[in-house]
């Protein structure tokens, strides 16, 4: 079953991306943050 999650920037804590995931582990991706204007680590938020 896929669950809906939000990805938030580790630096500024803004929620930039929404996605679905089907794995159990917490998701952590390097994505572009529009507020920081750079690629940062984005972690999963519920």
Swiss-Prot record:
Q: Which Gene Ontology BP annotations are present?
A: translation
Record keywords: Ribonucleoprotein, Ribosomal protein
Q: Name one GO molecular function term.
A: structural constituent of ribosome
User: What Gene Ontology cellular component terms go with this record?
Assistant: cytoplasm; ribonucleoprotein complex; ribosome
**Is Ribonucleoprotein included in the keywords of this UniProt record?**
yes
Family annotation (Pfam families): Ribosomal_L33 (PF00471)
Q: Does the keyword Ribosomal protein apply?
A: yes
The record's listing under SUPFAM superfamilies reads: Zn-binding ribosomal proteins
Taxonomic superkingdom: Bacteria
Supply the HAMAP family for this chain: Ribosomal_bL33
User: Which family is this protein grouped under?
Assistant: Belongs to the bacterial ribosomal protein bL33 family.
NCBIfam families for this protein: PRK00504.1, rpmG_bact
* Entry protein name: Large ribosomal subunit protein bL33B
Organism, scientific name: Mycoplasmopsis pulmonis (strain UAB CTIP) (Mycoplasma pulmonis)
Q: What gene does this protein come from?
A: rpmG2
């Amino acid at each position: 079953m896929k669950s809906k999650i939000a990805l938030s920037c580790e630096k500024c804590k803004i929620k930039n991306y929404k996605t679905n995931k089907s794995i159990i582990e917490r998701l952590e991706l390097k994505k572009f943050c529009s507020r920081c204007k750079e690629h940062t680590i984005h972690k999963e938020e519920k």
